[in-house]
Protein backbone atom coordinates (compact mmCIF):
# COMPACT_ATOMS: atom_id res chain seq x y z
CA UNK A 1 0.00 0.00 0.00
CA UNK A 2 1.32 3.44 -0.83
CA UNK A 3 1.09 6.76 1.05
CA UNK A 4 -1.42 8.97 -0.74
CA UNK A 5 -1.69 11.86 1.76
CA UNK A 6 1.81 13.37 1.23
CA UNK A 7 1.18 13.37 -2.53
CA UNK A 8 -2.20 15.07 -2.13
CA UNK A 9 -0.56 17.65 0.14
CA UNK A 10 2.06 18.29 -2.54
CA UNK A 11 -0.64 18.78 -5.19
CA UNK A 12 -2.42 21.28 -2.93
CA UNK A 13 0.85 23.12 -2.24
CA UNK A 14 1.71 23.38 -5.95
CA UNK A 15 -1.82 24.54 -6.76
CA UNK A 16 -1.60 27.32 -4.16
CA UNK A 17 1.88 28.39 -5.31
CA UNK A 18 0.72 28.39 -8.92
CA UNK A 19 -2.27 30.59 -8.02
CA UNK A 20 0.03 33.04 -6.22
CA UNK A 21 2.24 33.25 -9.30
CA UNK A 22 -0.76 33.84 -11.55
CA UNK A 23 -1.50 36.97 -9.57
CA UNK A 24 2.09 38.12 -9.08
CA UNK A 25 3.04 37.65 -12.74
CA UNK A 26 -0.27 39.11 -13.97
CA UNK A 27 -1.22 35.99 -15.92
CA UNK A 28 -4.50 37.34 -17.35
CA UNK A 29 -2.88 40.48 -18.78
CA UNK A 30 0.03 38.49 -20.20
CA UNK A 31 -2.31 35.97 -21.84
CA UNK A 32 -4.27 38.80 -23.45
CA UNK A 33 -1.07 40.49 -24.62
CA UNK A 34 0.25 37.19 -26.02
CA UNK A 35 -2.86 36.88 -28.19
CA UNK A 36 -2.31 40.44 -29.46
CA UNK A 37 1.36 39.78 -30.25
CA UNK A 38 0.56 36.53 -32.06
CA UNK A 39 -2.05 38.35 -34.14
CA UNK A 40 0.49 41.06 -35.07
CA UNK A 41 3.12 38.49 -36.03
CA UNK A 42 0.63 36.75 -38.31
CA UNK A 43 0.18 39.93 -40.36
CA UNK A 44 1.84 39.49 -43.80
CA UNK A 45 3.51 42.93 -43.69
CA UNK A 46 5.03 42.53 -40.22
CA UNK A 47 8.56 42.03 -41.65
CA UNK A 48 8.41 45.34 -43.48
CA UNK A 49 9.75 46.63 -40.15
CA UNK A 50 12.36 44.00 -39.20
CA UNK A 51 13.35 45.61 -35.89
CA UNK A 52 9.72 45.75 -34.71
CA UNK A 53 9.14 42.16 -35.84
CA UNK A 54 12.20 41.00 -33.89
CA UNK A 55 11.04 42.92 -30.81
CA UNK A 56 7.62 41.28 -31.07
CA UNK A 57 9.23 37.86 -31.42
CA UNK A 58 11.29 38.45 -28.30
CA UNK A 59 8.22 39.69 -26.40
CA UNK A 60 6.30 36.59 -27.47
CA UNK A 61 9.02 34.29 -26.12
CA UNK A 62 8.99 36.13 -22.79
CA UNK A 63 5.19 35.99 -22.53
CA UNK A 64 5.06 32.31 -23.51
CA UNK A 65 7.56 31.46 -20.77
CA UNK A 66 4.97 32.62 -18.20
CA UNK A 67 1.63 31.84 -19.85
CA UNK A 68 2.53 28.41 -21.25
CA UNK A 69 4.21 27.29 -18.02
CA UNK A 70 1.21 28.25 -15.88
CA UNK A 71 -1.15 26.58 -18.39
CA UNK A 72 0.99 23.44 -18.26
CA UNK A 73 0.97 23.56 -14.45
CA UNK A 74 -2.83 23.68 -14.33
CA UNK A 75 -3.26 20.86 -16.83
CA UNK A 76 -0.43 18.84 -15.31
CA UNK A 77 -1.87 19.00 -11.79
CA UNK A 78 -5.26 17.87 -13.13
CA UNK A 79 -3.58 14.97 -14.95
CA UNK A 80 -1.65 13.91 -11.84
CA UNK A 81 -4.84 13.97 -9.75
CA UNK A 82 -6.48 11.71 -12.34
CA UNK A 83 -3.53 9.30 -12.29
CA UNK A 84 -3.67 9.13 -8.49
CA UNK A 85 -7.36 8.25 -8.56
CA UNK A 86 -6.63 5.45 -11.01
CA UNK A 87 -3.72 4.22 -8.89
CA UNK A 88 -5.85 4.09 -5.73
CA UNK A 89 -8.81 2.40 -7.44
CA UNK A 90 -6.61 -0.27 -9.06
CA UNK A 91 -4.08 -0.45 -6.21
CA UNK A 92 -1.48 0.06 -8.95
CA UNK A 93 1.93 1.07 -7.60
CA UNK A 94 3.40 1.62 -11.08
CA UNK A 95 0.74 4.24 -11.91
CA UNK A 96 1.28 5.81 -8.48
CA UNK A 97 5.04 6.13 -9.12
CA UNK A 98 4.32 7.65 -12.53
CA UNK A 99 2.12 10.29 -10.88
CA UNK A 100 4.83 11.09 -8.31
CA UNK A 101 7.46 11.47 -11.06
CA UNK A 102 5.21 13.86 -13.00
CA UNK A 103 4.59 15.82 -9.82
CA UNK A 104 8.35 16.19 -9.25
CA UNK A 105 8.77 17.52 -12.79
CA UNK A 106 5.94 20.02 -12.27
CA UNK A 107 7.50 21.22 -9.01
CA UNK A 108 10.84 21.84 -10.72
CA UNK A 109 9.12 23.77 -13.52
CA UNK A 110 7.20 25.90 -11.01
CA UNK A 111 10.37 26.60 -9.00
CA UNK A 112 12.05 27.94 -12.15
CA UNK A 113 9.11 30.26 -12.76
CA UNK A 114 9.09 31.39 -9.12
CA UNK A 115 12.74 32.34 -9.53
CA UNK A 116 11.67 35.01 -12.02
CA UNK A 117 10.50 37.02 -9.04
CA UNK A 118 14.19 37.74 -8.47
CA UNK A 119 14.20 39.68 -11.74
CA UNK A 120 12.47 42.88 -10.69
CA UNK A 121 15.04 45.38 -12.02
CA UNK A 122 14.18 47.73 -14.86
CA UNK A 123 16.62 46.09 -17.28
CA UNK A 124 16.68 42.53 -15.92
CA UNK A 125 14.85 41.25 -19.00
CA UNK A 126 17.37 42.87 -21.37
CA UNK A 127 20.23 41.35 -23.34
CA UNK A 128 23.63 42.27 -21.93
CA UNK A 129 27.32 42.74 -22.55
CA UNK A 130 30.06 41.01 -20.56
CA UNK A 131 33.53 42.55 -20.47
CA UNK A 132 36.39 40.39 -19.18
CA UNK A 133 39.72 42.10 -18.48
CA UNK A 134 42.94 40.36 -17.46
CA UNK A 135 44.60 41.82 -14.38
CA UNK A 136 48.31 42.44 -13.95
CA UNK A 137 50.43 39.33 -14.07
CA UNK A 138 51.12 38.83 -17.75
CA UNK A 139 50.56 35.41 -19.31
CA UNK A 140 49.13 33.82 -16.17
CA UNK A 141 46.42 36.50 -15.80
CA UNK A 142 45.69 36.46 -19.54
CA UNK A 143 45.22 32.69 -19.48
CA UNK A 144 42.85 33.11 -16.52
CA UNK A 145 40.83 35.69 -18.48
CA UNK A 146 40.54 33.16 -21.32
CA UNK A 147 39.33 30.49 -18.87
CA UNK A 148 36.66 32.90 -17.60
CA UNK A 149 35.59 33.64 -21.18
CA UNK A 150 35.15 29.92 -21.85
CA UNK A 151 33.28 29.45 -18.56
CA UNK A 152 30.72 32.17 -19.34
CA UNK A 153 30.30 31.04 -22.96
CA UNK A 154 29.59 27.48 -21.74
CA UNK A 155 27.14 28.80 -19.13
CA UNK A 156 25.30 30.90 -21.72
CA UNK A 157 25.11 27.93 -24.10
CA UNK A 158 23.64 25.74 -21.34
CA UNK A 159 20.83 28.28 -20.84
CA UNK A 160 20.13 28.52 -24.56
CA UNK A 161 21.45 32.09 -24.78
CA UNK A 162 23.00 33.42 -27.98
CA UNK A 163 26.54 34.79 -27.72
CA UNK A 164 28.56 37.05 -29.99
CA UNK A 165 32.19 38.11 -29.58
CA UNK A 166 32.15 41.87 -30.14
CA UNK A 167 35.87 42.45 -29.58
CA UNK A 168 38.75 40.31 -28.37
CA UNK A 169 42.38 41.18 -27.70
CA UNK A 170 44.68 38.16 -27.65
CA UNK A 171 47.41 37.65 -25.08
CA UNK A 172 51.07 37.90 -26.00
CA UNK A 173 51.83 34.23 -25.24
CA UNK A 174 48.50 32.64 -24.33
CA UNK A 175 45.00 33.62 -23.31
CA UNK A 176 43.43 37.04 -23.83
CA UNK A 177 43.98 40.56 -22.56
CA UNK A 178 40.28 41.42 -22.86
CA UNK A 179 37.03 40.40 -24.51
CA UNK A 180 33.54 41.83 -24.91
CA UNK A 181 30.73 39.31 -25.36
CA UNK A 182 27.13 40.15 -26.19
CA UNK A 183 24.73 37.69 -24.53
CA UNK A 184 21.16 37.57 -25.85
CA UNK A 185 18.28 35.70 -24.26
CA UNK A 186 15.40 35.89 -21.82
CA UNK A 187 16.55 37.82 -18.72
CA UNK A 188 20.22 37.61 -19.76
CA UNK A 189 21.14 40.73 -17.77
CA UNK A 190 19.02 39.63 -14.80
CA UNK A 191 20.92 36.35 -14.64
CA UNK A 192 24.39 37.84 -15.01
CA UNK A 193 24.21 41.22 -13.26
CA UNK A 194 25.67 39.92 -9.98
CA UNK A 195 28.76 38.55 -11.77
CA UNK A 196 30.41 41.98 -11.96
CA UNK A 197 33.57 41.95 -9.88
CA UNK A 198 37.07 40.53 -9.51
CA UNK A 199 37.63 36.79 -9.92
CA UNK A 200 40.73 35.36 -8.18
CA UNK A 201 42.55 32.23 -9.36
CA UNK A 202 45.10 30.30 -7.31
CA UNK A 203 46.89 27.38 -9.01
CA UNK A 204 50.24 25.84 -9.89
CA UNK A 205 51.05 27.72 -13.05
CA UNK A 206 51.53 25.71 -16.27
CA UNK A 207 53.72 28.60 -17.43
CA UNK A 208 56.13 28.28 -14.47
CA UNK A 209 58.84 25.66 -15.06
CA UNK A 210 59.18 25.37 -11.29
CA UNK A 211 55.50 24.53 -10.88
CA UNK A 212 55.06 27.23 -8.27
CA UNK A 213 51.72 28.47 -7.01
CA UNK A 214 50.48 31.69 -8.62
CA UNK A 215 47.60 34.03 -7.84
CA UNK A 216 45.92 35.79 -10.76
CA UNK A 217 43.06 38.24 -11.06
CA UNK A 218 40.60 39.05 -13.84
CA UNK A 219 37.65 41.43 -13.80
CA UNK A 220 34.15 40.87 -15.15
CA UNK A 221 31.79 43.75 -15.86
CA UNK A 222 28.17 43.14 -16.91
CA UNK A 223 25.93 45.87 -18.30
CA UNK A 224 22.53 45.76 -20.04
CA UNK A 225 21.83 46.60 -23.65
CA UNK A 226 19.76 49.77 -23.38
CA UNK A 227 17.08 51.02 -25.75
CA UNK A 228 18.11 53.63 -28.30
CA UNK A 229 15.52 56.00 -26.86
CA UNK A 230 16.98 55.90 -23.33
CA UNK A 231 17.88 59.42 -22.23
CA UNK A 232 21.67 59.39 -21.90
CA UNK A 233 23.42 62.60 -22.88
CA UNK A 234 26.85 62.13 -24.44
CA UNK A 235 28.72 65.25 -25.46
CA UNK A 236 30.58 64.50 -28.73
CA UNK A 237 33.44 66.65 -27.43
CA UNK A 238 33.91 64.11 -24.62
CA UNK A 239 34.61 61.29 -27.08
CA UNK A 240 37.84 60.24 -28.76
CA UNK A 241 37.27 57.91 -31.70
CA UNK A 242 40.17 55.85 -33.07
CA UNK A 243 40.17 53.46 -36.02
CA UNK A 244 42.64 50.62 -36.45
CA UNK A 245 43.19 47.36 -38.27
CA UNK A 246 41.28 44.49 -36.72
CA UNK A 247 43.13 41.37 -35.64
CA UNK A 248 42.53 38.27 -33.57
CA UNK A 249 39.23 36.53 -32.90
CA UNK A 250 36.33 38.29 -34.51
CA UNK A 251 38.53 40.31 -36.81
CA UNK A 252 40.43 37.94 -39.09
CA UNK A 253 38.32 38.79 -42.13
CA UNK A 254 38.73 42.56 -41.89
CA UNK A 255 42.38 43.12 -41.01
CA UNK A 256 43.35 44.66 -44.35
CA UNK A 257 41.48 47.90 -43.68
CA UNK A 258 41.11 50.16 -40.67
CA UNK A 259 37.57 48.97 -39.95
CA UNK A 260 37.90 48.42 -36.20
CA UNK A 261 36.71 51.27 -33.98
CA UNK A 262 37.69 52.25 -30.43
CA UNK A 263 35.73 54.94 -28.56
CA UNK A 264 37.02 56.55 -25.35
CA UNK A 265 34.78 58.60 -23.06
CA UNK A 266 37.37 61.05 -21.76
CA UNK A 267 35.63 62.18 -18.51
CA UNK A 268 35.19 58.61 -17.19
CA UNK A 269 37.95 56.78 -19.07
CA UNK A 270 35.44 54.20 -20.30
CA UNK A 271 36.55 52.48 -23.51
CA UNK A 272 34.45 50.46 -25.95
CA UNK A 273 35.63 48.85 -29.15
CA UNK A 274 34.26 46.70 -31.93
CA UNK A 275 35.96 44.88 -34.80
CA UNK A 276 33.56 42.09 -35.73
CA UNK A 277 32.16 43.63 -38.93
CA UNK A 278 33.71 44.53 -42.29
CA UNK A 279 32.05 47.94 -42.09
CA UNK A 280 33.72 50.67 -40.04
CA UNK A 281 30.33 52.40 -39.84
CA UNK A 282 28.65 49.33 -38.31
CA UNK A 283 31.52 48.83 -35.88
CA UNK A 284 31.23 52.48 -34.80
CA UNK A 285 27.47 52.10 -34.27
CA UNK A 286 28.04 48.99 -32.14
CA UNK A 287 30.79 50.67 -30.09
CA UNK A 288 28.52 53.68 -29.49
CA UNK A 289 25.72 51.36 -28.39
CA UNK A 290 28.06 49.74 -25.88
CA UNK A 291 29.26 53.17 -24.69
CA UNK A 292 25.68 54.24 -24.06
CA UNK A 293 24.99 51.02 -22.17
CA UNK A 294 28.16 51.32 -20.07
CA UNK A 295 27.45 54.93 -19.12
CA UNK A 296 23.91 53.97 -18.14
CA UNK A 297 25.15 51.09 -15.99
CA UNK A 298 27.77 53.35 -14.39
CA UNK A 299 25.07 55.87 -13.51
CA UNK A 300 22.89 53.15 -11.98
CA UNK A 301 25.82 51.81 -9.95
CA UNK A 302 26.62 55.29 -8.69
CA UNK A 303 23.05 55.73 -7.49
CA UNK A 304 23.15 52.37 -5.73
CA UNK A 305 26.50 53.23 -4.17
CA UNK A 306 25.11 56.48 -2.83
CA UNK A 307 22.27 54.58 -1.18
CA UNK A 308 24.80 52.33 0.53
CA UNK A 309 27.07 55.22 1.56
CA UNK A 310 29.97 53.87 -0.47
CA UNK A 311 30.91 57.07 -2.26
CA UNK A 312 34.32 57.00 -0.59
CA UNK A 313 35.54 54.23 -2.88
CA UNK A 314 34.59 55.10 -6.43
CA UNK A 315 37.02 52.60 -7.91
CA UNK A 316 34.67 49.84 -6.77
CA UNK A 317 31.76 51.36 -8.66
CA UNK A 318 33.17 50.48 -12.05
CA UNK A 319 34.52 47.00 -11.50
CA UNK A 320 33.23 45.92 -8.11
CA UNK A 321 35.41 44.09 -5.60
CA UNK A 322 36.58 40.50 -5.35
CA UNK A 323 33.54 38.22 -5.57
CA UNK A 324 34.82 34.68 -6.05
CA UNK A 325 37.93 32.67 -5.33
CA UNK A 326 38.97 29.70 -7.49
CA UNK A 327 41.64 27.66 -5.64
CA UNK A 328 42.36 24.79 -8.02
CA UNK A 329 45.08 23.08 -5.94
CA UNK A 330 42.62 22.61 -3.08
CA UNK A 331 39.71 21.86 -5.45
CA UNK A 332 37.67 24.67 -3.94
CA UNK A 333 35.66 27.51 -5.45
CA UNK A 334 34.02 29.90 -3.00
CA UNK A 335 31.76 32.91 -3.47
CA UNK A 336 33.04 35.48 -1.00
CA UNK A 337 29.69 37.29 -0.80
CA UNK A 338 27.26 34.43 -0.18
CA UNK A 339 29.58 31.76 1.23
CA UNK A 340 28.46 29.23 -1.40
CA UNK A 341 31.29 26.77 -1.98
CA UNK A 342 31.94 23.73 -4.18
CA UNK A 343 34.78 21.30 -4.70
CA UNK A 344 33.72 20.37 -8.23
CA UNK A 345 36.01 22.97 -9.79
CA UNK A 346 35.97 21.49 -13.29
CA UNK A 347 32.17 21.61 -13.50
CA UNK A 348 32.22 25.32 -12.60
CA UNK A 349 34.94 26.10 -15.13
CA UNK A 350 32.80 24.20 -17.66
CA UNK A 351 29.95 26.63 -17.02
CA UNK A 352 28.07 25.24 -14.01
CA UNK A 353 27.46 28.63 -12.37
CA UNK A 354 23.79 28.52 -11.42
CA UNK A 355 24.38 27.68 -7.74
CA UNK A 356 26.48 30.84 -7.34
CA UNK A 357 24.23 33.08 -9.43
CA UNK A 358 21.00 31.92 -7.77
CA UNK A 359 22.45 32.41 -4.28
CA UNK A 360 23.61 35.95 -5.06
CA UNK A 361 20.23 36.87 -6.57
CA UNK A 362 18.36 35.43 -3.58
CA UNK A 363 20.65 37.44 -1.30
CA UNK A 364 19.59 40.59 -3.15
CA UNK A 365 23.10 41.49 -4.31
Curated annotation (Swiss-Prot):
GO terms for cellular component: cytoplasm. Its main location: cytoplasm. It comes from the Bacteria. It is found in: Cytoplasm. Methylated by PrmC. Methylation increases the termination efficiency of RF2. The modification N5-methylglutamine is found at residue 252. InterPro entries: PCRF, Pep_chain_release_fac_I, Pep_chain_release_fac_I_sf, PrfB. Keywords: Cytoplasm, Methylation, Protein biosynthesis. The keyword Isomerase does not apply. Peptide chain release factor 2 directs the termination of translation in response to the peptide chain termination codons UGA and UAA. Belongs to the prokaryotic/mitochondrial release factor family. This is Peptide chain release factor 2. It comes from Escherichia coli O8 (strain IAI1).
